[in-house]
Amino acid sequence: MATKGLGNETLVTSILRSNTVLVEVGGSVRRITVENFMNAINNGDEQMLRQVAWGIPIKQSTQSSTNYGVIGNTAAWTEYKLYCGRYLVTNDGRAAKMSPTNSAVFADGTAVDETKGHVMWIGPRLYYRVQTDSVSGVPVLWLSMLPIGGEFIGGANGGMYNCIGAYKGSMSGSALVSRSGVAPAGSKTINAFWNAAQVNGKEWGLTDYDQRKLIMMLGLSQYGDTNIQAKLGYGVGGSSSKDLWAAAAALQTGATKSLGDNWGKIAISVVNGSNTGVDCSRVNMMGIEDPYGWQWEFLQGVFCGSSNNSAQSGTEIFIYKGNRLPTTAELAAHPNGEYRQATRQTASGQVQEIILGEHFDIFPKKIGGNSTSYWADYSWANTTGQLVLWGGNAYDGANCGLASASSSNYWSYSLASVGSRLAYFGNLTFVSGASLMAA
């Protein structure tokens, strides 16, 4: 066989994480995947991380205060925000940027007709890595637009972007949509919501667990604090745990259109009979409206085990890949295909610690504290619930937030105060507002 000169092989301009490169190890030539090569280079390189990433020290095991702070290259966080915001996305993936200060018009000044698509939040893939600081011993969540080892969150365009409903999901005919000026849909099972999302096309689904982790990352990056309600606003349910649902159910999406891609709140009055809400507001997380405190949201990409199933103990958390929901057989055992497993806390209570780990799992690990300490949110769980809900509703007041979770309900559960948020997992084509409206 003739020898081949590596220097004469075909040049390429890009590679995948799964591709391999040649390296010298102990005097011998070896192959290594690009992903493992990046991890090896970056392993333990704290100075590099401080240059290219911003970090949040996760101090849950050392303090009850919710103030964690932000370290590293905070200018990189400012830059990341510039690439994020609201777009109108058509069913086939054409996306036009809306004005960053007024979601009634596109960035080019063209008036928005929401019936031609869905109002979605789009942001670039975000790399993350959890690494224990060598000096303080505190785990730090490092985030960057650049590869830093660890993992990344990106569900659309081959993993290059995240595309999440800016508003809570509502119904237009048989389709789940993300539009302003309508009441969010409820009283449907997760399967019914997912099927309604699929009416838009096979690349449409519901917000998944990874995207909920991303929303948590955004909140921590902006405030360096786990108590999002105290920093941004308490949401529709306010700061006191009163039954405000009947009044909250009459509210409509799009209250934050005037806030565009910014962080902020709009104070509102919510009165349900003799119950008057305190500190009620509509909140906006750089274009994502009301991710907590109004209506629970179903999550795809995750389910829990049930002690009623012979193959499960009820402590399992299954996190699986793909824009799909589990089958009945999977719910009774484990997901098919690629998945990983974690262990859930099966007691309800205030969230003192999250699982964290290398995957930045945001399920509760330890219960304790109150609504102003540790993670400042409440979790509902047991050994039989398989559904995963996130964010809390207008019954729960200060118990709601970005760490507020529920895994205590059976799979076919439905309630008016439980809804969904649309997500898109396909390819995106970026166009101007004028061309999108003219099509």
Residue ranges, per PLM feature:
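GGW-centered surface loops in extracellular recognition modules
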Residues: 45-122, 128-130, 439
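A short, polar/charged loop-to-alpha-helix boundary motif
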Residues: 305-322
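Short, surface-exposed terminal/edge motifs of secreted or surface/virion proteins that either
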Residues: 23-43
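Short hydrophobic/aromatic-rich beta-strand motifs
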Residues: 18-25, 287-289
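Short, intrinsically disordered N-terminal pre-domain segments
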Residues: 1-18, 436-439
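Short aromatic-cysteine micro-motif
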Residues: 110-117, 142-291, 295
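Short, flexible beta-strand-to-coil junctions
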Residues: 22-29, 57-62, 167-170
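C-terminal, surface-exposed recognition/capping segments
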Residues: 54, 211-213, 234-258, 262, ...
